[in-house]
Protein backbone atom coordinates (compact mmCIF):
# COMPACT_ATOMS: atom_id res chain seq x y z
CA UNK A 1 0.00 0.00 0.00
CA UNK A 2 1.44 3.39 -1.03
CA UNK A 3 2.24 5.82 1.77
CA UNK A 4 0.67 9.27 1.42
CA UNK A 5 3.58 11.72 1.09
CA UNK A 6 1.68 14.35 3.00
CA UNK A 7 0.98 12.03 5.92
CA UNK A 8 4.67 11.12 6.07
CA UNK A 9 5.92 14.70 5.98
CA UNK A 10 3.24 16.47 7.99
CA UNK A 11 1.11 16.00 11.08
CA UNK A 12 -2.16 17.64 12.08
CA UNK A 13 -2.21 20.03 15.05
CA UNK A 14 -5.12 22.11 16.28
CA UNK A 15 -5.76 25.38 18.05
CA UNK A 16 -8.88 27.43 18.77
CA UNK A 17 -9.31 28.15 15.05
CA UNK A 18 -9.18 24.53 13.97
CA UNK A 19 -6.73 22.10 12.43
CA UNK A 20 -3.36 23.03 10.93
CA UNK A 21 -0.90 20.93 8.96
CA UNK A 22 2.58 21.13 10.56
CA UNK A 23 5.89 19.62 9.35
CA UNK A 24 6.16 16.20 10.97
CA UNK A 25 9.52 16.76 12.66
CA UNK A 26 8.89 20.33 13.79
CA UNK A 27 8.74 21.06 17.51
CA UNK A 28 6.37 23.95 16.90
CA UNK A 29 2.63 23.50 16.68
CA UNK A 30 -0.49 25.11 15.25
CA UNK A 31 -0.13 28.77 16.22
CA UNK A 32 3.47 28.92 15.07
CA UNK A 33 2.56 27.31 11.76
CA UNK A 34 -0.20 29.84 11.16
CA UNK A 35 2.31 32.64 11.71
CA UNK A 36 4.81 31.01 9.34
CA UNK A 37 2.13 30.97 6.64
CA UNK A 38 0.87 34.47 7.43
CA UNK A 39 4.24 36.27 7.44
CA UNK A 40 6.60 35.04 4.69
CA UNK A 41 8.00 38.57 4.42
CA UNK A 42 11.73 39.07 5.00
CA UNK A 43 13.17 35.65 5.74
CA UNK A 44 14.66 37.17 8.90
CA UNK A 45 13.66 35.74 12.25
CA UNK A 46 14.34 36.81 15.80
CA UNK A 47 17.90 37.52 16.87
CA UNK A 48 19.57 34.60 18.65
CA UNK A 49 19.94 36.75 21.75
CA UNK A 50 16.19 37.22 21.98
CA UNK A 51 15.51 33.51 21.60
CA UNK A 52 17.96 32.99 24.46
CA UNK A 53 16.12 35.59 26.55
CA UNK A 54 12.76 33.94 25.87
CA UNK A 55 14.19 30.65 27.12
CA UNK A 56 15.58 32.27 30.26
CA UNK A 57 12.28 33.99 30.93
CA UNK A 58 10.10 30.90 30.48
CA UNK A 59 12.30 28.94 32.85
CA UNK A 60 12.15 31.69 35.47
CA UNK A 61 8.36 31.96 35.17
CA UNK A 62 7.98 28.20 35.62
CA UNK A 63 10.18 28.30 38.70
CA UNK A 64 8.09 31.05 40.29
CA UNK A 65 4.79 29.38 39.37
CA UNK A 66 6.06 26.22 41.04
CA UNK A 67 7.30 28.08 44.12
CA UNK A 68 3.84 29.63 44.48
CA UNK A 69 2.14 26.25 44.22
CA UNK A 70 0.45 27.09 40.92
CA UNK A 71 2.33 24.59 38.75
CA UNK A 72 3.06 20.96 39.54
CA UNK A 73 6.77 20.34 40.21
CA UNK A 74 6.96 17.74 37.43
CA UNK A 75 5.64 20.24 34.90
CA UNK A 76 7.83 23.03 36.22
CA UNK A 77 10.94 20.86 35.97
CA UNK A 78 10.06 19.92 32.39
CA UNK A 79 9.55 23.57 31.41
CA UNK A 80 12.78 24.65 33.11
CA UNK A 81 14.79 21.92 31.37
CA UNK A 82 13.31 22.64 27.93
CA UNK A 83 13.69 26.39 28.39
CA UNK A 84 17.35 25.91 29.29
CA UNK A 85 17.90 24.04 26.02
CA UNK A 86 16.32 26.95 24.15
CA UNK A 87 18.44 29.48 26.01
CA UNK A 88 21.56 27.47 25.16
CA UNK A 89 20.77 27.60 21.45
CA UNK A 90 19.91 23.94 20.92
CA UNK A 91 16.64 24.67 19.13
CA UNK A 92 17.19 27.90 17.18
CA UNK A 93 15.98 26.19 14.01
CA UNK A 94 12.58 25.75 15.67
CA UNK A 95 11.91 29.50 15.62
CA UNK A 96 10.89 30.07 11.98
CA UNK A 97 8.58 33.08 12.32
CA UNK A 98 9.48 36.25 10.45
CA UNK A 99 10.40 39.33 12.48
CA UNK A 100 7.63 41.20 10.66
CA UNK A 101 4.69 39.60 12.43
CA UNK A 102 2.03 40.57 14.92
CA UNK A 103 3.34 43.67 16.66
CA UNK A 104 3.05 42.29 20.18
CA UNK A 105 5.31 39.33 19.45
CA UNK A 106 2.44 36.95 20.29
CA UNK A 107 3.45 34.60 17.49
CA UNK A 108 7.00 34.25 18.81
CA UNK A 109 5.80 33.92 22.39
CA UNK A 110 3.52 31.06 21.35
CA UNK A 111 6.35 29.61 19.26
CA UNK A 112 8.39 29.42 22.46
CA UNK A 113 5.51 27.92 24.44
CA UNK A 114 4.85 25.27 21.79
CA UNK A 115 8.49 24.25 21.41
CA UNK A 116 8.83 23.88 25.18
CA UNK A 117 5.68 21.74 25.30
CA UNK A 118 6.98 19.50 22.50
CA UNK A 119 10.39 19.04 24.13
CA UNK A 120 8.67 18.11 27.39
CA UNK A 121 6.41 15.65 25.56
CA UNK A 122 9.48 13.78 24.32
CA UNK A 123 10.39 13.29 27.97
CA UNK A 124 6.95 12.01 28.82
CA UNK A 125 5.52 15.19 30.38
CA UNK A 126 2.36 16.63 28.87
CA UNK A 127 2.21 20.44 28.89
CA UNK A 128 -0.34 22.82 27.47
CA UNK A 129 1.39 25.74 25.71
CA UNK A 130 -1.03 28.28 27.18
CA UNK A 131 -2.20 26.81 30.47
CA UNK A 132 1.17 25.54 31.67
CA UNK A 133 4.07 27.17 29.80
CA UNK A 134 2.38 30.58 29.56
CA UNK A 135 0.94 30.47 33.09
CA UNK A 136 0.75 33.91 34.79
CA UNK A 137 1.94 35.55 31.57
CA UNK A 138 0.75 37.15 28.36
CA UNK A 139 2.65 37.98 25.21
CA UNK A 140 2.26 41.63 26.15
CA UNK A 141 4.57 41.34 29.13
CA UNK A 142 6.77 38.39 28.12
CA UNK A 143 7.91 39.60 24.71
CA UNK A 144 8.98 43.09 25.83
CA UNK A 145 10.59 41.53 28.91
CA UNK A 146 12.64 39.18 26.75
CA UNK A 147 13.62 42.10 24.53
CA UNK A 148 14.90 44.12 27.47
CA UNK A 149 16.74 41.13 28.96
CA UNK A 150 18.49 40.54 25.64
CA UNK A 151 19.32 44.21 25.15
CA UNK A 152 20.65 44.61 28.68
CA UNK A 153 22.82 41.52 28.34
CA UNK A 154 24.06 42.74 24.95
CA UNK A 155 25.06 46.06 26.50
CA UNK A 156 26.69 44.80 29.68
CA UNK A 157 28.29 41.54 28.57
CA UNK A 158 29.25 42.40 25.01
CA UNK A 159 29.15 46.01 23.79
CA UNK A 160 30.70 47.77 26.78
CA UNK A 161 33.70 45.38 26.90
CA UNK A 162 34.17 45.74 23.13
CA UNK A 163 34.09 49.52 23.33
CA UNK A 164 36.53 49.40 26.24
CA UNK A 165 38.90 47.37 24.08
CA UNK A 166 38.63 49.95 21.30
CA UNK A 167 39.12 52.81 23.75
CA UNK A 168 42.24 51.16 25.15
CA UNK A 169 43.70 50.66 21.67
CA UNK A 170 43.12 54.32 20.79
CA UNK A 171 44.49 55.49 24.14
CA UNK A 172 47.63 53.42 23.63
CA UNK A 173 48.26 55.15 20.31
CA UNK A 174 47.62 58.52 21.94
CA UNK A 175 50.41 57.82 24.43
CA UNK A 176 52.76 56.36 21.82
CA UNK A 177 52.36 59.42 19.60
CA UNK A 178 52.08 62.19 22.17
CA UNK A 179 55.14 63.99 20.73
CA UNK A 180 54.53 63.20 17.04
CA UNK A 181 53.72 66.65 15.69
CA UNK A 182 51.53 67.20 12.64
CA UNK A 183 49.50 69.91 10.99
CA UNK A 184 46.12 70.46 12.50
CA UNK A 185 43.19 70.85 10.12
CA UNK A 186 39.96 72.79 10.42
CA UNK A 187 37.47 72.99 7.54
CA UNK A 188 39.80 70.46 5.83
CA UNK A 189 42.36 73.27 5.61
CA UNK A 190 45.76 73.65 7.28
CA UNK A 191 45.64 74.87 10.87
CA UNK A 192 48.11 75.25 13.74
CA UNK A 193 50.00 72.13 14.81
CA UNK A 194 48.71 69.35 17.01
CA UNK A 195 50.21 66.00 17.84
CA UNK A 196 48.97 62.72 16.47
CA UNK A 197 48.60 61.65 20.08
CA UNK A 198 46.28 64.56 20.81
CA UNK A 199 44.07 63.56 17.91
CA UNK A 200 43.90 59.98 19.12
CA UNK A 201 43.19 61.12 22.66
CA UNK A 202 40.11 62.80 21.25
CA UNK A 203 39.05 59.58 19.57
CA UNK A 204 39.60 57.66 22.81
CA UNK A 205 37.42 60.15 24.68
CA UNK A 206 34.64 59.76 22.10
CA UNK A 207 34.54 56.03 22.77
CA UNK A 208 34.78 56.56 26.53
CA UNK A 209 31.79 58.90 26.33
CA UNK A 210 29.95 56.26 24.30
CA UNK A 211 30.49 53.75 27.10
CA UNK A 212 29.16 56.30 29.58
CA UNK A 213 26.05 56.84 27.45
CA UNK A 214 25.31 53.11 27.32
CA UNK A 215 25.77 52.78 31.07
CA UNK A 216 23.53 55.77 31.68
CA UNK A 217 20.58 54.17 29.90
CA UNK A 218 20.82 50.81 31.71
CA UNK A 219 18.47 51.73 34.58
CA UNK A 220 15.62 52.16 32.06
CA UNK A 221 16.73 49.44 29.67
CA UNK A 222 16.82 46.94 32.53
CA UNK A 223 13.20 47.56 33.57
CA UNK A 224 11.11 44.44 32.89
CA UNK A 225 7.38 44.34 32.19
CA UNK A 226 6.85 40.79 33.45
CA UNK A 227 3.90 40.57 35.85
CA UNK A 228 1.86 43.19 34.03
CA UNK A 229 0.20 40.53 31.81
CA UNK A 230 -2.14 41.89 29.12
CA UNK A 231 -2.55 45.61 29.89
CA UNK A 232 -0.41 46.36 32.93
CA UNK A 233 -2.96 45.55 35.63
CA UNK A 234 -1.44 42.17 36.46
CA UNK A 235 -4.70 40.32 35.87
CA UNK A 236 -4.18 36.51 35.99
CA UNK A 237 -0.81 36.77 37.73
CA UNK A 238 0.00 36.71 41.46
CA UNK A 239 0.71 40.12 42.93
CA UNK A 240 4.43 39.49 43.44
CA UNK A 241 4.94 37.40 40.31
CA UNK A 242 7.04 39.99 38.45
CA UNK A 243 9.28 40.71 41.43
CA UNK A 244 9.93 37.01 41.95
CA UNK A 245 10.66 36.36 38.27
CA UNK A 246 13.12 39.24 38.11
CA UNK A 247 14.93 37.88 41.17
CA UNK A 248 15.34 34.50 39.46
CA UNK A 249 16.59 36.16 36.27
CA UNK A 250 19.15 38.27 38.13
CA UNK A 251 20.43 35.17 39.92
CA UNK A 252 20.69 33.21 36.65
CA UNK A 253 22.25 35.90 34.47
CA UNK A 254 24.24 37.94 36.95
CA UNK A 255 22.68 41.05 35.42
CA UNK A 256 22.11 43.28 38.44
CA UNK A 257 20.72 45.91 36.05
CA UNK A 258 17.48 43.92 35.64
CA UNK A 259 14.61 45.16 37.78
CA UNK A 260 10.84 45.19 37.96
CA UNK A 261 9.34 48.03 35.93
CA UNK A 262 8.67 51.18 37.93
CA UNK A 263 5.28 51.40 36.22
CA UNK A 264 3.81 48.40 34.45
CA UNK A 265 1.57 50.53 32.24
CA UNK A 266 4.54 52.46 30.86
CA UNK A 267 6.50 49.23 30.50
CA UNK A 268 3.91 47.76 28.12
CA UNK A 269 2.43 50.82 26.44
CA UNK A 270 5.76 52.49 25.59
CA UNK A 271 9.21 51.43 24.48
CA UNK A 272 11.07 54.56 25.56
CA UNK A 273 13.84 52.51 27.17
CA UNK A 274 14.67 50.95 23.81
CA UNK A 275 14.47 54.31 22.06
CA UNK A 276 16.87 55.83 24.60
CA UNK A 277 19.33 52.96 24.31
CA UNK A 278 19.18 53.07 20.52
CA UNK A 279 19.97 56.78 20.72
CA UNK A 280 23.14 55.94 22.63
CA UNK A 281 24.05 53.40 19.94
CA UNK A 282 23.38 55.97 17.23
CA UNK A 283 25.76 58.39 18.94
CA UNK A 284 28.43 55.70 19.08
CA UNK A 285 27.87 55.06 15.37
CA UNK A 286 28.37 58.77 14.69
CA UNK A 287 31.59 58.74 16.74
CA UNK A 288 32.90 55.68 14.92
CA UNK A 289 32.16 57.27 11.57
CA UNK A 290 34.20 60.34 12.46
CA UNK A 291 37.10 58.27 13.76
CA UNK A 292 37.10 55.86 10.81
CA UNK A 293 36.91 58.67 8.27
CA UNK A 294 39.80 60.56 9.88
CA UNK A 295 41.90 57.41 9.84
CA UNK A 296 41.03 56.78 6.19
CA UNK A 297 42.05 60.31 5.29
CA UNK A 298 45.29 60.17 7.26
CA UNK A 299 46.13 56.86 5.60
CA UNK A 300 45.22 57.98 2.09
CA UNK A 301 47.82 57.60 -0.61
CA UNK A 302 50.32 56.08 -0.84
CA UNK A 303 51.63 58.85 -3.12
CA UNK A 304 48.76 61.22 -3.87
CA UNK A 305 47.06 61.35 -0.47
CA UNK A 306 47.99 62.58 3.00
CA UNK A 307 50.08 59.48 3.82
CA UNK A 308 50.42 60.55 7.46
CA UNK A 309 49.84 57.07 8.84
CA UNK A 310 49.91 53.57 7.43
CA UNK A 311 47.07 51.13 7.98
CA UNK A 312 47.74 47.39 8.22
CA UNK A 313 47.57 45.62 4.86
CA UNK A 314 44.73 43.14 5.34
CA UNK A 315 43.77 42.00 1.84
CA UNK A 316 44.20 42.86 -1.85
CA UNK A 317 42.07 45.88 -2.64
CA UNK A 318 41.28 45.58 -6.30
CA UNK A 319 40.34 42.88 -8.76
CA UNK A 320 41.87 44.89 -11.61
CA UNK A 321 44.60 47.14 -10.13
CA UNK A 322 47.53 44.97 -8.93
CA UNK A 323 49.11 45.93 -5.63
CA UNK A 324 46.28 48.19 -4.49
CA UNK A 325 45.39 47.96 -0.79
CA UNK A 326 42.32 49.65 0.65
CA UNK A 327 41.21 50.73 4.15
CA UNK A 328 38.76 47.86 4.41
CA UNK A 329 38.13 47.94 8.15
CA UNK A 330 37.35 51.67 8.37
CA UNK A 331 34.98 51.10 5.45
CA UNK A 332 33.30 48.25 7.34
CA UNK A 333 33.02 50.51 10.39
CA UNK A 334 31.25 53.25 8.44
CA UNK A 335 28.85 50.76 6.86
CA UNK A 336 27.97 49.38 10.29
CA UNK A 337 27.42 52.93 11.48
CA UNK A 338 25.04 53.59 8.59
CA UNK A 339 23.05 50.47 9.47
CA UNK A 340 22.87 51.40 13.15
CA UNK A 341 21.66 54.90 12.31
CA UNK A 342 19.02 53.41 10.01
CA UNK A 343 17.99 50.95 12.71
CA UNK A 344 17.65 53.83 15.14
CA UNK A 345 15.32 55.71 12.81
CA UNK A 346 13.03 52.68 12.62
CA UNK A 347 13.20 52.20 16.40
CA UNK A 348 12.23 55.82 16.98
CA UNK A 349 9.31 55.45 14.58
CA UNK A 350 8.21 52.27 16.32
CA UNK A 351 8.47 53.87 19.74
CA UNK A 352 6.39 56.83 18.66
CA UNK A 353 3.57 54.67 17.36
CA UNK A 354 2.48 52.79 20.45
CA UNK A 355 -1.26 53.08 21.08
CA UNK A 356 -2.98 53.12 24.46
CA UNK A 357 -1.94 50.08 26.54
CA UNK A 358 0.47 48.40 24.11
CA UNK A 359 3.23 49.19 21.68
CA UNK A 360 2.80 46.97 18.62
CA UNK A 361 6.15 47.53 16.92
CA UNK A 362 8.16 45.44 19.38
CA UNK A 363 9.45 42.63 17.09
CA UNK A 364 10.93 45.12 14.64
CA UNK A 365 12.33 47.31 17.41
CA UNK A 366 13.81 44.29 19.15
CA UNK A 367 15.43 42.95 16.00
CA UNK A 368 16.89 46.35 15.13
CA UNK A 369 18.35 47.21 18.52
CA UNK A 370 19.78 43.73 19.04
CA UNK A 371 21.31 43.84 15.57
CA UNK A 372 22.79 47.25 16.37
CA UNK A 373 24.32 45.91 19.58
CA UNK A 374 25.77 42.94 17.71
CA UNK A 375 27.17 44.98 14.83
CA UNK A 376 28.77 47.61 17.06
CA UNK A 377 30.23 44.94 19.35
CA UNK A 378 31.82 42.96 16.53
CA UNK A 379 33.10 45.88 14.51
CA UNK A 380 34.56 47.64 17.57
CA UNK A 381 36.62 44.58 18.45
CA UNK A 382 37.80 44.14 14.88
CA UNK A 383 38.61 47.84 14.50
CA UNK A 384 40.73 47.69 17.65
CA UNK A 385 42.49 44.41 16.87
CA UNK A 386 42.98 44.52 13.12
CA UNK A 387 43.31 48.23 12.43
CA UNK A 388 44.11 50.53 15.36
CA UNK A 389 46.68 48.23 16.98
CA UNK A 390 48.62 47.98 13.71
CA UNK A 391 48.70 51.66 12.74
CA UNK A 392 52.13 53.21 12.18
CA UNK A 393 52.99 56.89 11.86
CA UNK A 394 55.14 58.49 9.15
CA UNK A 395 56.80 60.73 11.73
CA UNK A 396 59.18 62.75 9.53
CA UNK A 397 56.54 63.33 6.88
CA UNK A 398 54.12 64.54 9.54
CA UNK A 399 56.65 67.02 10.88
CA UNK A 400 57.48 68.34 7.41
CA UNK A 401 53.79 68.97 6.76
CA UNK A 402 53.43 70.74 10.10
CA UNK A 403 56.44 72.97 9.45
CA UNK A 404 55.30 73.81 5.92
CA UNK A 405 51.81 74.91 6.97
CA UNK A 406 51.26 78.67 6.65
CA UNK A 407 49.18 78.52 9.82
CA UNK A 408 52.30 78.23 11.98
CA UNK A 409 52.62 82.00 11.54
CA UNK A 410 49.93 82.32 14.25
CA UNK A 411 52.37 82.64 17.24
CA UNK A 412 53.90 85.68 15.54
CA UNK A 413 50.70 87.72 15.93
CA UNK A 414 51.82 89.26 19.22
CA UNK A 415 55.20 90.27 17.77
CA UNK A 416 54.37 91.56 14.26
CA UNK A 417 50.58 91.92 14.35
CA UNK A 418 47.76 89.99 12.70
CA UNK A 419 47.84 91.82 9.35
CA UNK A 420 51.61 91.50 8.89
CA UNK A 421 51.40 87.83 9.91
CA UNK A 422 48.70 87.29 7.27
CA UNK A 423 50.95 88.92 4.67
CA UNK A 424 53.81 86.63 5.69
CA UNK A 425 51.58 83.56 5.33
CA UNK A 426 50.34 84.58 1.88
CA UNK A 427 53.84 85.39 0.62
CA UNK A 428 55.27 82.14 1.99
CA UNK A 429 52.53 80.17 0.27
CA UNK A 430 52.93 82.04 -3.01
CA UNK A 431 56.73 81.79 -3.10
CA UNK A 432 56.83 78.24 -1.68
CA UNK A 433 59.10 79.35 1.15
CA UNK A 434 59.03 78.59 4.84
CA UNK A 435 57.45 81.02 7.27
CA UNK A 436 60.86 81.50 8.88
CA UNK A 437 62.56 82.47 5.64
CA UNK A 438 59.72 84.77 4.63
CA UNK A 439 59.88 86.64 7.96
CA UNK A 440 63.59 87.19 7.40
CA UNK A 441 63.07 88.21 3.75
CA UNK A 442 60.51 90.83 4.79
CA UNK A 443 63.02 92.40 7.19
CA UNK A 444 60.98 91.68 10.30
CA UNK A 445 63.91 90.63 12.47
CA UNK A 446 64.73 93.49 14.80
CA UNK A 447 63.71 95.02 18.10
CA UNK A 448 60.28 93.39 18.15
CA UNK A 449 61.43 89.96 17.01
CA UNK A 450 64.88 88.43 17.38
CA UNK A 451 66.02 85.40 15.42
CA UNK A 452 66.05 83.40 18.65
CA UNK A 453 62.51 84.49 19.46
CA UNK A 454 61.44 83.63 15.91
CA UNK A 455 62.79 80.10 16.21
CA UNK A 456 61.17 79.69 19.62
CA UNK A 457 57.81 80.85 18.32
CA UNK A 458 58.02 78.60 15.24
CA UNK A 459 58.75 75.41 17.23
CA UNK A 460 55.84 73.32 15.98
CA UNK A 461 55.98 70.83 18.86
CA UNK A 462 55.89 73.65 21.39
CA UNK A 463 52.88 75.11 19.56
CA UNK A 464 51.05 71.83 20.02
CA UNK A 465 51.60 71.93 23.80
CA UNK A 466 52.16 68.20 23.80
CA UNK A 467 52.97 68.21 27.50
CA UNK A 468 49.29 68.89 28.22
CA UNK A 469 48.24 65.34 27.23
CA UNK A 470 47.12 63.80 30.52
CA UNK A 471 47.75 60.06 30.42
CA UNK A 472 45.63 59.56 33.53
CA UNK A 473 42.54 60.75 31.64
CA UNK A 474 42.93 58.43 28.66
UniProtKB/Swiss-Prot annotation:
<feature type="binding site">
    <location>
        <position position="319"/>
    </location>
    <ligand>
        <name>substrate</name>
    </ligand>
</feature>
<dbReference type="GO" id="GO:0005576">
    <property type="term" value="C:extracellular region"/>
</dbReference>
<feature type="binding site">
    <location>
        <begin position="104"/>
        <end position="106"/>
    </location>
    <ligand>
        <name>substrate</name>
    </ligand>
</feature>
<dbReference type="InterPro" id="IPR005677">
    <property type="entry name" value="Fum_hydII"/>
</dbReference>
<feature type="binding site" description="in site B">
    <location>
        <begin position="128"/>
        <end position="131"/>
    </location>
    <ligand>
        <name>substrate</name>
    </ligand>
</feature>
<feature type="binding site">
    <location>
        <position position="186"/>
    </location>
    <ligand>
        <name>substrate</name>
    </ligand>
</feature>
<protein>
    <recommendedName>
        <fullName>Fumarate hydratase class II</fullName>
        <ecNumber>4.2.1.2</ecNumber>
    </recommendedName>
</protein>
<keyword id="KW-0456">Lyase</keyword>
<dbReference type="Pfam" id="PF00206">
    <property type="entry name" value="Lyase_1"/>
</dbReference>
<feature type="active site">
    <location>
        <position position="318"/>
    </location>
</feature>
<keyword id="KW-0007">Acetylation</keyword>
<feature type="site" description="Important for catalytic activity">
    <location>
        <position position="331"/>
    </location>
</feature>
<keyword id="KW-0963">Cytoplasm</keyword>
<keyword id="KW-0816">Tricarboxylic acid cycle</keyword>
<dbReference type="GO" id="GO:0005829">
    <property type="term" value="C:cytosol"/>
</dbReference>
<feature type="binding site">
    <location>
        <begin position="138"/>
        <end position="140"/>
    </location>
    <ligand>
        <name>substrate</name>
    </ligand>
</feature>
<comment type="function">
    <text>Involved in the TCA cycle. Catalyzes the stereospecific interconversion of fumarate to L-malate.</text>
</comment>
<dbReference type="GO" id="GO:0004333">
    <property type="term" value="F:fumarate hydratase activity"/>
</dbReference>
<feature type="binding site">
    <location>
        <begin position="324"/>
        <end position="326"/>
    </location>
    <ligand>
        <name>substrate</name>
    </ligand>
</feature>
<dbReference type="GO" id="GO:0005886">
    <property type="term" value="C:plasma membrane"/>
</dbReference>
<dbReference type="InterPro" id="IPR018951">
    <property type="entry name" value="Fumarase_C_C"/>
</dbReference>
<dbReference type="GO" id="GO:0006106">
    <property type="term" value="P:fumarate metabolic process"/>
</dbReference>
<dbReference type="Pfam" id="PF10415">
    <property type="entry name" value="FumaraseC_C"/>
</dbReference>
<dbReference type="InterPro" id="IPR000362">
    <property type="entry name" value="Fumarate_lyase_fam"/>
</dbReference>
<dbReference type="GO" id="GO:0009274">
    <property type="term" value="C:peptidoglycan-based cell wall"/>
</dbReference>
<feature type="modified residue" description="N-acetylalanine">
    <location>
        <position position="2"/>
    </location>
</feature>
<dbReference type="InterPro" id="IPR022761">
    <property type="entry name" value="Fumarate_lyase_N"/>
</dbReference>
<dbReference type="GO" id="GO:0006099">
    <property type="term" value="P:tricarboxylic acid cycle"/>
</dbReference>
<comment type="subunit">
    <text>Homotetramer.</text>
</comment>
<dbReference type="InterPro" id="IPR024083">
    <property type="entry name" value="Fumarase/histidase_N"/>
</dbReference>
<dbReference type="InterPro" id="IPR008948">
    <property type="entry name" value="L-Aspartase-like"/>
</dbReference>
<comment type="pathway">
    <text>Carbohydrate metabolism; tricarboxylic acid cycle; (S)-malate from fumarate: step 1/1.</text>
</comment>
<feature type="active site" description="Proton donor/acceptor">
    <location>
        <position position="187"/>
    </location>
</feature>
<dbReference type="InterPro" id="IPR020557">
    <property type="entry name" value="Fumarate_lyase_CS"/>
</dbReference>
<comment type="similarity">
    <text>Belongs to the class-II fumarase/aspartase family. Fumarase subfamily.</text>
</comment>
Amino acid sequence: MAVDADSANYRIEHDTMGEVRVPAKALWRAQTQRAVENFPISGRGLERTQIRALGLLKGACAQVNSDLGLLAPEKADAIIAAAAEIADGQHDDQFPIDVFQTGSGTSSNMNTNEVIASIAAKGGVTLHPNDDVNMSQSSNDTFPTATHIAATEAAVAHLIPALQQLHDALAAKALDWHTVVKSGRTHLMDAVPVTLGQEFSGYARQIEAGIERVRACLPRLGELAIGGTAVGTGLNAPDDFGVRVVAVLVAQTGLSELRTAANSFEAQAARDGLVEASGALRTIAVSLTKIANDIRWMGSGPLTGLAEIQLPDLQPGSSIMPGKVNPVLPEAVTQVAAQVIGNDAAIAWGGANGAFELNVYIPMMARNILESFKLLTNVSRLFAQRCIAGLTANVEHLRRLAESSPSIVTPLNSAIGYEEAAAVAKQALKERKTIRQTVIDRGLIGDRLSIEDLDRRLDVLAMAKAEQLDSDRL
